[in-house]
A protein has these predicted regions:
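Bacterial N-terminal signal peptides
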Residues: 10-21
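Short loop/turn segments that connect beta-strands within beta-propeller blades
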Residues: 114-116, 161-164, 214-216, 296-298, ...
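Extracytoplasmic beta-rich repeat domains
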Residues: 81-94, 122-144, 170-185, 203, ...
Length: 584
């Protein structure tokens, strides 16, 4: 364990002094009245609460709360703010029974009063040596019974007592000494903690997805995202030995459908990034850049769809899979690709959203993985078609890389048309609200020596504008889930790298690279409210209600820098801050 730094001592002193002014009885009463979170609550959350990453297991990012609506959102004002831990900030606050749980960089967790930010308790995990670069991006935790469950930078699952912050159990799942870590947090489905491992860059393994007993932490099953020799899909890695089959991080949270008993998880890129570096040229390298549907009881892969076979360009596909029941009536002129064999007007359960960096909405049958339709939301040249029979995308041969340092114009950049910031869905409109960005890069692969213990950094990318760019980088597109039509598109100079919150008040909240946090009319795309923050917001916005008052919360700090394309829009590092708004 490392010795506390002077900064940590200073912060602890300040917090202790501030806490002295908080009525102890009020804080204790709030914690004493905290009720256990049941499996039924997780499946159908109370409307006042936000219990998991995107609020519900289907990843809608939607709350039915409607006190704040189109008629009064213009009156939103700041209720309170809270300075957060410095470091990489991509967090999702959770709220239950008036208590907010705030995961922060490098596994620092605080519980605060959700009405004013008064601190209740804190947990700080010791920082281990040689921590992986991206390990401190603590995106989410989850609530279950009396527990707050976190997945840590040192590859542990940890259960904290939600009333006290004390550790009730912990389980080691990966090996932090070789870079394995969690960045996407846990989800609890049907009593199981579902997580995906990240950081499988260095040693003789790809990554995996696990289920653990939510009461004890006992591991129930483990499914490899990169198959070994002799396993189904293993042949797609050619003759590459197991110890060099690397990558396949599952670095964002899973979604779940109880009726199908399926877990939906996205998988990232192979390592190194280029097929000529891996010596896998011509192979699909399953299950990288894929959507996986797993049996929740066994971890068996029921179906998969590979969005990019044999990846070369760091175009990850680990993002949210949104589960929606809808009519499927895609309009051929409105979408990029369509399955000609689908039964039009048939109502079915689908997986939709933007699962990967190219910024394409993919819609698949949730039960079978059958491809239905796909639609581009930003300029991209990576995917040019769909192999329906082969269950995979078709990549652009013009950007295929056959030599080290061979330069190609690839769109989007390695930061993506989209990234970890999430699409939102509203059941009121049956539409997705998709943030994305028009970017390209000059991209080339560097020499690597693919040996056990070698780092994965394997390419150079230089951000450039897309061909014939008009200078507008950021987009927010409302996409009809049934037809694929764009209901409306908002475009602007600044990048839009914020997650979307949709509400029962007919609103769409999203932040951008220029520090603006806005509320849009979900039907028309009109901007109804705007607040300038101290920084762009890398966190996920939420809404909740306490004592009949609805609040909107957003964690600022972090985000993606598009300065090469928009040099006049300045960003300053640090400054992590939670903002909470309400009506007067």
């Amino acid at each position: 364990m490392q010795n506390p730094t002077a900064r940590q001592y200073c912060l602890a002193t300040i917090l202790a002094a501030f806490a002295a002014f908080i009525p102890v009885a009020v804080a204790q009463s709030l914690l004493d009245n905290y009720s256990p979170v049941s499996l039924a609550d997780l499946q159908d959350p109370p409307e006042n609460d936000w219990l998991m990453w995107r609020r519900t297991a289907n990843h809608w990012g939607y709350s039915p709360l409607a006190q704040i609506d189109k008629t009064n959102v213009g009156s939103l004002r700041l209720a309170w703010a809270w300075t957060m831990e410095p470091g990489r900030q991509e967090t999702t606050p959770l709220v239950h029974d008036g208590v907010m749980f705030l995961p922060q960089a490098c596994d620092f967790i605080e519980a605060v009063d959700a009405t004013d930010g008064s601190p209740l308790w804190e947990y700080r995990r010791p920082v281990v040596d040689h921590i992986a670069t991206l390990a401190c991006a603590n995106r989410n935790a989850t609530l279950y019974k009396d527990q707050l469950i976190i997945a840590t930078m040192d590859a542990y699952l940890v259960s904290l007592n939600a009333r006290t912050g004390e550790v009730t159990w912990e389980r080691q799942v990966g090996d932090w000494t070789v870079g394995q870590h969690y960045s996407g947090g846990p989800q609890v489905f049907d009593g199981k903690i579902i997580t995906g491992m990240s950081g499988c860059y260095y040693i003789n393994t790809g990554c995996w997805i696990t289920a653990h007993d939510a009461d004890t932490g006992e591991e129930l099953w483990r499914t490899n995202t990169v198959p070994k020799i002799g396993e189904p899909g293993g042949e797609t890695w050619g003759d590459l030995p197991n110890e060099l089959r690397r990558g396949g991080s599952a670095w964002m949270p899973a979604s779940y459908d109880a009726e199908l008993n399926l877990i939906f998880m996205g998988v990232a890129v192979p390592i190194p990034w280029g097929s000529i570096q891996r010596d896998t040229r011509g192979g699909d390298v399953l299950y990288t850049n894929s959507t996986l549907a797993l049996n929740a009881d066994t971890g068996e892969i029921v179906w998969y769809f590979q969005h990019i076979p044999g990846g070369n360009w760091d175009q990850d596909h680990p993002f949210e899979r949104i589960v929606v029941e809808t009519e499927v009536t895609p309009v051929a002129d409105a979408v990029s690709w369509i399955n000609p064999n689908i039964t039009s007007s048939a109502r079915r359960k689908v997986i939709t959203g933007i699962p990967g960096k190219p910024g394409i909405v993919w819609t698949l049958d949730a039960a079978t993985g059958e491809f239905l339709w796909a639609k581009e939301t930003n300029y991209q040249n990576v995917i040019v078609g769909v192999d329906i029979e082969g269950r995979k995308g078709i990549t652009n041969p013009e950007i295929d890389i056959t030599e080290i340092r061979q330069r190609k114009l690839v769109c989007p950049t390695t930061t993506g048309g989209t990234n970890w910031f999430s699409v939102g869905y509203s059941p009121q409109t049956n539409a997705l609200y998709a943030p994305s960005n028009n970017t390209c890069m000059t991209f080339y692969l560097n020499p690597v020596n693919p040996v056990v213990g070698g780092y994965h950094s394997s390419a150079t990318s230089i951000m450039v504008p897309p061909p014939d760019s008009d200078g507008q980088v950021g987009l927010l597109t409302a996409v009809d889930v049934a037809t694929g039509e764009a209901r409306w598109t908002y475009r602007q100079r600044a990048g839009i790298a914020g997650s979307v919150l949709t509400t029962g008040g007919g609103l769409v909240f999203v932040s951008d690279d220029a520090r603006r946090f806005r509320a849009f009319d979900a039907d028309s795309g009109e901007i109804l409210w705007e607040q300038i923050l101290n920084s762009s917001a890398g966190g996920f916005p939420i809404t909740y209600s306490v004592d009949g008052v609805q609040y909107i919360a957003i964690a600022a700090g972090g985000g993606i820098n598009y300065r090469t394309l928009t040099p006049e829009i300045r960003q300053r590092g640090g400054g992590n801050m939670l903002y909470v708004f309400r009506l007067p």
